[in-house]
Amino acid sequence: MHQVVSATTNPAKIQAILRAFEEIFGEGSCHIEAVAVESGVPEQPFGSEETRAGARNRVLNAKALRSDADFWVAIEAGIDDGATFSWVVIENREQRGEARSATLPLPAIILEKVRAGEALGPVMSQYTGIDEIGRKEGAIGVFTAGALTRSSVYHQAVILALSPFHNAIYR
């Protein structure tokens, strides 16, 4: 059984990680331990590079905290060019896999508040009246009318980031 450390305690992210690992490695193939670690970037990262740096830093910090795991996984959400997205970083002892998620354009009224310094999650909670929406369906669930959720979009990115770990051609 794979010991997987999730560098987040966010339920939407943990669900995405668990589903992806089970799809790739089989049901019941992993145990996930969630840890709270720092990203080393602002609460609301801007730009692809800052967001990816946050995910990489979370993996590094999770490895320092739980060095005996088989995999360390981080999902860092950010804002880039008027849209929200995330970077997924997965490492084991030999290699790293990274993938950027799908991108959701944000309405101007939401972007205005985020650019003024508020994090997207609290802004969306104010807009929708849903407490801690970032730990649930997220802006993605709201603006896709539930066709996608934050977790489902992260799930795809985790699957992509796992590609180097089960395809020999990457080694």
From Swiss-Prot:
Under the subunit heading, UniProt states: Homodimer.
* Known catalytic reactions: XTP + H2O = XDP + phosphate + H(+); ITP + H2O = IDP + phosphate + H(+)
Q: What does this protein do?
A: Phosphatase that hydrolyzes non-canonical purine nucleotides such as XTP and ITP to their respective diphosphate derivatives. Probably excludes non-canonical purines from DNA/RNA precursor pool, thus preventing their incorporation into DNA/RNA and avoiding chromosomal lesions.
Question: What Pfam families does the record tag this protein with?
Answer: NTPase_I-T (PF01931)
Q: Which Gene3D superfamilies match?
A: 3.90.950.10
Query: What is the recorded name of this protein?
Result: Inosine/xanthosine triphosphatase
Sites binding substrate sit at: T8, T9, N10, P11, A12, K13, D68, A69
Q: What's a GO biological-process term for it? A: nucleotide metabolic process
NCBIfam families per the UniProt record, alphabetical = inosine/xanthosine triphosphatase, PRK05074.1
Supply the source organism's classification. Answer: Bacteria, Pseudomonadati, Pseudomonadota, Gammaproteobacteria, Enterobacterales
Which residues are Mg(2+)-binding? E38, D68
Per the UniProt entry, the Enzyme Commission number(s) are 3.6.1.73
Question: Is-annotated flag, keyword Zinc?
Answer: no
* Keywords tagged on the record: Hydrolase, Magnesium, Manganese, Metal-binding, Nucleotide metabolism, Nucleotide-binding
Entry's cofactor comment: Binds 1 divalent metal cation per subunit; can use either Mg(2+) or Mn(2+).
Q: Does the keyword Zinc apply?
A: no
The record ties this protein, via InterPro entries, to: ITPase-like_fam, Non_canon_purine_NTPase, NTPase/PRRC1, YjjX_NTPase
Q: Which cofactor does it need?
A: Mg(2+); Mn(2+)
Protein family membership: Belongs to the YjjX NTPase family.
Organism (species): Enterobacter sp. (strain 638)
